[in-house]
Structures are given as C-alpha cells and as structure tokens.
Amino acid sequence: MVMKKLLFILSFSLMSFMTLAQDVVVIKHTNYTTHFSKSKKYPVMVQWETTNAMVTCPTPLKRKDNFKPDPQLPVETNIGNDYVKSGYDRGHVMPAADNLCQTPQIQDECFYFSNMIPQTHRLNAGDWKSLETATREWAVISSKVRVWSGAIGEEKKIGAISVPKQCWKVVQIAGKWKAYLFNNDLSNPDGFDNNEVPLAQIEKLTGFKFR
C-alpha cells in the first residue's frame, strides 16, 4: 500500500514536471533569457546581467515604448490588445532602463511581450520601479549584478493573459543574495526593502534553484 502511494506521488510529480516543461518556452535574446508560459501568457522567469557599462554612458538612448510580439513566439505573444483598458500596466521584467546604453535593437528586444507582466500601476510605478533603480545602482557600485525575476499564480484574466498574484526578483551582488516578493495588488508594505524575503522562500514558490 505504501509502495503504491509512493509510486502515485512520483508519477504525479513527473506528469506535473512534463506539463510545465511543455508549457514553458525558453527564448534567448541579446541581453536576457525569458522563460515564457504559453498558457499564462507571461514569463515565469527572466534572467539577465546588468553591468556598469550598460547603464552609464554620456548619451543614453531615448525610451521608445515599442511594445510588440516576440518574433520567436509570434502567436503566443500577440497579446497587446488584451492590455488595452485592462487597468494593468505592461510591466517590464528586465527593465527598459537597463538597456539605455545599448543599441536600438537591444532596446527594442526589451519591449517584447515575452518580457512583460500585467502589473498594477501602483506596483509597476512604485516599489517595483524603485527596486529596478536600486539594482542599477548596485551594478554601478559592484560593476555587475545577476538578476532573476518573474511572476507566479493567477489572480484573474485580462483577455488571454493571466494576471499573476505575485511578482518576485532575486539579485546576486558580489556573491551576496537579495530576494524580493510583491503581491500584485495594493497590499504590499511601502518600500521595496520591506518586501525582502529569504531566498529559500522564492525557491520554494517558483521551483527554481538559484544557488
């Protein structure tokens, strides 16, 4: 009886892993790699490095909000109209400002929908943006930071897109780790530093291992 139960659990876990593997598409762009969920229509994880040279230059590019489908996943990411009048921002995972000292092509890649999460404006323009700014400052100080970021869960749908319950970010700075978890609503405490959590909590929630 115990053996049958164990085999059932192992079989269920394997099926869940296979389903996830079939759903998530990994796409490599110049400055970031996105793990895009075809069912949720948002990236469960995006990973990149931000360096001092990427964010400090005498003539940074002007931001162009050229949101568009990812050419490597055109059908699944042709979701721009779903954001219209939805009440949610097209929240960057890898920030556009991390590419202002790059080429126009690299900046354009940052506006693919495979790098977007539906976020409340309060989060996107508030603590999420403040954490993005802090991460760039850490990159200047330490010359480079490694970043993993994404979303989990489903609060509701806007068109075909799942609105995630939570957004998270992990930053490695000179061998030290920082992890942050935000609810995608109005319930977060003010200040991104007040949303710092143990790295193990992010690993448990997402299933990703960072160390």
State the predicted function of each range:
Residues P71-R211:
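Domain-level detector of nuclease and nuclease-like folds
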Residues L7-L14:
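Sec-dependent signal peptide hydrophobic core
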Residues I27-D89:
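Short, His- and charge-rich active-site/binding loops that engage polyanionic ligands
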